[in-house]
Amino acid sequence: LVTPAMKGIVEDIPETGTTLRANSLQKAQYIFDHAGGADCFADDTGLETDILGGAPGVYSARYAGPEKSFSANIDKLLDEMARREYEASVAREYGLETPNATRRARFKTVITLILNGEKHFFEGVMEGRISYERVGNGGFGYDPVFIADEYPDVTVAELSDDQKNAISHRGKALRAMAAWLHEHASK
């Protein structure tokens, strides 16, 4: 396994797609093109919330701005969700329907593998919900406010590495890619 830096790719790889798949493909293609056509893979990950219509989604890392601050991203997410929940409660008082006014959310990862010049895609999803406040010190990103369905009483930031890896979106996508490689490498 070789990292992009080992191939001389040290710059930030562009992420201009509007979907996780597009960004994952863009990153893998960039590595492929700048590493002499070497087999490679890249991923993109995002957090999708029902109440915010899928946001932050593809913009998860820079949701609160280009500086990519995890803390600012969480602050913005919690503020936006609270505002939408308030709007939904007012609408319900007037008898209006408020579809998707829940804290349901999911992490998604899409991996693009370029093998022998052919592109293959693998996806992993971790379903859950967003808590009302940060809890836990582990993990990174949105982990302190994400409660996975498999562990409904704690945030992902409170899980051990083994617990998180067993259920994580990225782990699921990597296992799908590994299974595909195992199956196709034997042919």
Description of each model-found segment:
Residues 1-187:
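Anionic-ligand binding patches
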